[in-house]
Amino acid sequence: MPKTAFLILKSPQELDPTHTMKRFADSQDASAILVEDGVYHAMLARPAERLAKVAKDVLVSGDDLEARGFQASDLKMGRVVDYAGIVECIMERTDRTITV
């Protein structure tokens, strides 16, 4: 199965991306990239637990986290990256990108 980056833009209240992620990638081949309101998936316990089951790597946009008044210590999971880190994941470590 191809390595897939899932770009998650919406909050957990708007969307549970895990169903789509399971359909298109094995958890060992999936990376979740949380941007915009998608960063809330890494800050709330239940969404973070669900995401941990379907993605090997979870990247959280530091700029989007900061724009919402939060910091890395507020995360339940994942690691904060800058846009260069997001681009590197998409271009160098995955075969395709799916926006959910």
Where are these regions (language model features)?
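Short, well-ordered alpha-helix to beta-strand connector turns
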Residues: 28, 55, 94-95
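Conserved phosphate/oxyanion-binding catalytic-loop motifs
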Residues: 64-70
